[in-house]
Regions:
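Alpha-helical junction/boundary sensor with strong preference for TPR arrays
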Residues: 84, 91, 127-128, 164-165, ...
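Extracytoplasmic/periplasmic C-terminal soluble domains
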Residues: 152-206
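Alpha-helical adaptor scaffolds
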Residues: 77, 97-169
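N-terminal positive-inside, membrane-proximal cytosolic segments immediately preceding the first
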Residues: 1-31
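Short extracytoplasmic
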Residues: 58-90
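Structural signature of alpha-solenoid helical repeat junctions
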Residues: 51-52, 56, 76-79, 92, ...
Length: 206
């Protein structure tokens, strides 16, 4: 029930936070525990790795943008998966790797390879994705599990995660799962919570 704009704002907020604070936070921690010489060496290394990861991510974006009408060729898809795997394997702690894995999951869903999509989203959650990005990935993972009729697993995923600003979407999805499982009372409770959280979000936006 929460608007699509909410997810877009979550992603944009994460991108902005990383651009403004992510690298400074990492380098700041090192400065506390390291000396000036170590700082210079580490600063150079991190900057180099960040730029390399950024370049690979830009290649992925360029490949997608150049596809006519958004229709990716098989060559495009192979290229995106290849560069995504490179980011995951060589720069797995960066936001670029997390976004690449999410992109790979999207392509896997479009290819009806739900197992691969689930693996990619789990990789994001297991490899230090920022808290701002986690609720989006968690919700998508739960819906994928539901799509292959793993309803109890989908519920478990949602119940064990912090929904962040996606509380309404989490509760609505829980309601859908409870209905499939014929747990009607719990479904109505979840739907009511979704409505309340959605109204609360609307008030914050106004």
């Amino acid at each position: 029930m929460v608007s699509e704009r909410t997810e877009e704002e979550q992603i944009e907020a994460f991108k902005n936070w990383w651009a403004e604070n992510g690298l400074k936070t990492i380098l700041g921690i090192f400065l506390i525990f390291g000396g000036y010489v170590g700082w210079q060496s580490y600063e150079s290394k991190v900057a180099s790795e960040s730029q390399a990861a950024s370049d690979i991510w830009q290649t992925i974006i360029t490949t997608m943008n150049e596809a006519p009408d958004g229709n990716l060729s098989q060559e495009n898809i192979v290229s995106i998966h290849k560069n995504g795997d490179k980011l995951k394997n060589e720069y797995g702690s960066t936001s670029y790797a997390h976004f690449a894995a999410a992109m790979k999951a999207k392509l896997a869903v479009e290819a009806n390879n739900i197992e691969l999509a689930v693996q990619e989203l789990n990789w994001v959650l297991d490899n230090g994705a920022d808290n701002a990005f986690v609720p989006i990935i968690t919700l998508r993972l739960a819906k994928l599990e539901a799509s292959r009729k793993n309803y109890e697993e989908a519920l478990k995923i949602l119940e064990n995660a912090d929904p962040g600003t996606l509380k309404s979407s989490f509760e609505e999805t829980k309601g859908d799962l409870y209905m499939v499982l014929e747990r009607t009372d719990e479904a109505y409770t979840a739907y009511n919570s979704a409505i309340l959280f959605n109204k609360s979000s609307d008030q914050l936006l106004n």
